């Protein structure tokens, strides 16, 4: 089994170039996507998706916070939009013109890393394209845990013990966005 990273971030669904869908269809599509991505082993959970209504679309966009379990790292989950998970690819292809902006922070305790990524997923000419806009990685330690906004030094010690006491681990995670 792969190591699992703890991930927090946002998905922004930009419908500016989606021509043939009503606002009701767009919201229904987001809810279907959230359901699909939330019911797998390496899930992505959008807690507010169920509460969306057509009036949730502002300036052709909807932004949702998410939490997830990354397969090794969350960039691997994002790659599934383009390749490797047919049901997800087919669903996304239904929304020709959509651009999804994904912004996240994560940490993984097996390989001891923190990462911050920005990706886009776009459907253009009936093809799903994934683009890495930025990716920053560093070692997970008390300093990066605090400076990347995952929590305080006290919280790090509570979760992991002193760096010298490793491998004490805790599954609790309360990340705060870097932005």
Language model regions located:
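Surface patches in mature domains of proteins
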Residues: 34-48
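Charged interaction segments
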Residues: 45-179
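Short, extreme N-terminal segment that most often corresponds to the first beta-strand
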Residues: 1-37
């Amino acid at each position: 089994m792969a190591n699992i990273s703890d991930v927090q971030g946002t998905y922004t669904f930009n419908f500016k170039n989606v021509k043939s869908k009503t606002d009701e269809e767009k919201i229904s599509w987001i809810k279907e996507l959230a359901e699909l991505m939330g019911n797998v082993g390496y899930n992505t959970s959008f807690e507010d998706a169920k509460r969306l209504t057509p009036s949730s679309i502002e300036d052709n966009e909807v932004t949702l916070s998410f939490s997830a379990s990354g397969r090794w790292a969350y960039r691997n989950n994002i790659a599934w939009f383009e390749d490797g998970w047919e049901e997800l690819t087919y669903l996304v292809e239904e929304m020709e013109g959509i651009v999804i902006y994904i912004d996240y922070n994560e940490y993984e305790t097996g390989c001891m890393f923190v990462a911050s990524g920005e990706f886009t997923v776009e459907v253009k000419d009936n093809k799903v394209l994934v683009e890495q806009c930025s990716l920053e990685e560093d070692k997970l330690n008390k300093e990066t845990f605090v400076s990347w906004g995952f929590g305080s030094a006290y919280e790090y010690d509570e979760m992991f013990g002193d760096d010298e006491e490793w491998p004490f681990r805790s599954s609790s995670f309360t990340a705060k966005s870097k932005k």
